Amino acid sequence: MIYQNREEFKNANMFGEGAPNDGYARYFTGNSYLNPLVAPGQAPLFLANVTFEPGCRNNWHIHHAEKGGGQMLICTAGEGWYQEEGKEPVSLHEGSFVYIPAEVKHWHGAKADSWFSHISLEVPGEDCRNEWLEPVTDEVYGRL
């Protein structure tokens, strides 16, 4: 469901908007918010609800790992996009699930006309690290 009104979206976003995602703001076009569901190191998996304002998206990035690793997204509210390099974008909505293996260049974010949130799970592995790359240009995003 498309949410243009922030208050309506907040009511639908069952895992909460969280705080401005200032620590990662340089890797996003637009404003995002982060609500950790477990504290880092508290559980074997780090889980957080990430919220994107309309038009917000993260840069292209890769989750590297020597073994295992990657990322999973569980879409919780609103509508967004996911795209792997060289592939067509995938429309996301509440209930969508995306598994992103390690070493896959990709990006994800909100549609231009809707707030969007997903739970992000970092898949355990060996020597896991993220490589943040170039922004998704307005030209590329505008064609969606």
Annotate each language-model stretch with its function.
Residues 1-46, 129-144:
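A short, N-terminal "cap"/entry segment at the start of jelly-roll beta-barrel domains
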Residues 34-35, 82, 118:
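Short hydrophobic/aromatic-rich beta-strand segments that constitute the beta-sheet cores
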Residues 49-53, 64-82, 121-124:
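Short, conserved beta-strand element in jelly-roll/cupin
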Residues 59-61, 82-83, 100, 105-112:
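Short beta-strand His + acidic residue motifs that chelate non-heme Fe in jelly-roll/DSBH
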Residues 72, 99, 113-132:
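A short hydrophobic beta-strand segment most commonly corresponding to one strand
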Residues 86-103:
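Short acidic-glycine-tyrosine-enriched beta hairpin
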